[in-house]
Amino acid sequence: MQYRFKDAEIGVDSPFKEDKLGREKYANILTNIIAHDHEGCVISLSGAWGAGKTTFVKMWKQMLKNKGYKTIYYNAWESDFVEDPLVAMIAEVGELSQEEKFKDLFASVIANAGKITLAATPKIVKHIVEKHIGSDAADCISDMLEEGASALKEQIDKYYEERKSLTSFRAQLKGLVDQLTEQPLIFFVDELDRCNPHHAVKVLERVKHLFSIPNIIFILSVDKQQLSNSIRGYFGSDRIDAEEYLRRFIDIEYFLPEPNYDYYIKYLCDDLNFKGFFFGNNSDMPSSAYSFFEEFVRSLAGCKKLTLRQMQKLLVSVRLVYCSLNTNREELPGLILLLLYIRSYHLGLYEDIVNHQLTRQKLVSELDRILPNSLFVRKKYSEYDVPIILFPFCDLLVYYMTTDSYSTESKLWKVDESDTSKLNVFFTSEHFTPEDIARYAKSLRRGSSPRLSYVTNFIELSEELRLED
């Protein structure tokens, strides 16, 4: 049984073959940008967490490799433990320098990098004062002046040495890159926004100050909002203009467009075989029931701005609960989806539902209030136009009212199929007409419905089912 998605396979010859988001065109645009830049630059590829940036970057990297570019993929988060990211970044360059003819050049790069200070300049005065606490005041001042002058000269000499080493480092690195490739070297930096603030800022500084040479193009794959939070955390102030600070390091900013929800949701539903839940062995079941479920998912994803990762999690969660129930009731996927939505975004209402704290009418009124308007848009079902949410909405009510005393759907309403005006519904909704309810009632599978607790017990088995995590 499938409960999680594997990373997309990236084919060597056709890296975007498994691209389900139609993003190859963006890779082509970005490739055209870097193809005409031999001076070196830093490009930020911005997208929200869970938007598929890493998959896109790896596909694009392979595309560039196929075009003859030398590329490096550096996961900054995985190297977060390294005190100075310069070490890891140079090591990545070394992976391209394995041939004998490059070894001397790479050795020179390492030698010069080793001379560059890896720690911040000490605060000379603080160091000296701490050293002399408790000494005679006159001697302390005298010693401080003498030692301060000596320490200052030492730091100035060190500064000159580091500046010279920095110039040599850039020259040797440029020579190595020029030997490695005639085209720009493309250096991808991924997961920067997941690093601790100190490491994230240090990576930016190293990219800008040490690797700013012709023929190297850096691609920073980031969630700009999260990276801005890291910068504020680094400086210890929410008043820092983090976006302005980032502009010092980034030459070109490219926002990865949001994916096509329709196409991606269809892919997810197909991959998780939701059609099998609706049809099973019943080939006569109306196909519109499945399309309504897809539309339900699509509307929720759109109104809550779910990321790709959240959409995956949502549908895997529905599948997990459904399969745990060990039943073939086709109304359950939509009902589970509705309950997960309520649990994730309206926890108080969800707890009232689980604990049966609401009257039938109060539950209907609360659902009317909290559900997005997009879910009440009407869509063709069989020969009728009914709201997208009609079936899960009424299913929830049926399951909610199924107790020892309310054992069947017929207890909730009485329907004369030849005359919907005789419909006797024991609740009112501002979004549904009596005819809507009659059409729902006619579609019901006859017989007793399980209790709602039968479904919610499986939902409660895992805290991982919260969509906003």
Regions found by a protein language model. Name each.
Residues I43, I72, L185-F187:
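Hydrophobic positions in the central parallel beta-sheet of the AAA+
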Residues L45, W49:
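The conserved Walker
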Residues K53:
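Conserved lysine of the Walker
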Residues V57-G175:
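P-loop NTPase nucleotide-binding core
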Residues N75-E78, D251-D262:
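Conserved AAA+ ATPase "SRH/arginine-finger" region at the nucleotide-binding site
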Residues Q155-Q225, Y234:
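Conserved Walker B catalytic segment
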Residues L227-R248:
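Short regulatory helix/loop adjacent to the ATP-binding pocket of P-loop NTPases
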